[in-house]
Amino acid sequence: MMPFDIRVGQGYDVHALVPGRKLILGGVHIPHDRGLLGHSDADALLHAITDALFGAAGLGDIGRHFPDTDAQFAGADSRVLLREAARRVREAGYEIGNVDASVIAQQPKLAPHIPGMVANIADDLGLPATRCNVKAKTNEKLGFEGRQEGIVAQAAVLIWRGAIADAQD
């Protein structure tokens, strides 16, 4: 019998806000005069969660699996990347326990969009929404986030493998 193995992963991502791009966070299009600059759709929230999953499983990071130097990922939908990351984590023998994430942005206000983000993350990871949490924070007008030059996302995930008692959600 395999011993119980519980792990925590932490993810971080940041992208600059620029004109002429859509703002997508948690797979949700958010109306704004600027969007995030990046090789893919630049969804900082999903990138942070993806990085946390890979890190928890000891599988490296998002750049190792989906390099921004690879043309096949140009404009990629980060929800597709998140689903693939979850598949690889499960292929390594782990179950995903929960996700807790924060998005730091002065503007736009994200609270109205959080239920959609949570629904997308839960759907992509095959988890109940009760195990996915997204928080929106400002940086109190400090730093590049406060000056509305970019958006930061941070995420923590719990994964496990081995015998575990049935848990109730």
UniProtKB/Swiss-Prot annotation:
Coiled-coil annotated spans: none
Enzyme class, spelled out: lyase
The keyword Membrane appears for this protein: no
Cofactors demanded by this protein: a divalent metal cation
Biochemical pathway: Isoprenoid biosynthesis; isopentenyl diphosphate biosynthesis via DXP pathway; isopentenyl diphosphate from 1-deoxy-D-xylulose 5-phosphate: step 4/6
Catalytic activity: 4-CDP-2-C-methyl-D-erythritol 2-phosphate = 2-C-methyl-D-erythritol 2,4-cyclic diphosphate + CMP
Subunit (UniProt): Homotrimer.
Record protein name field: 2-C-methyl-D-erythritol 2,4-cyclodiphosphate synthase
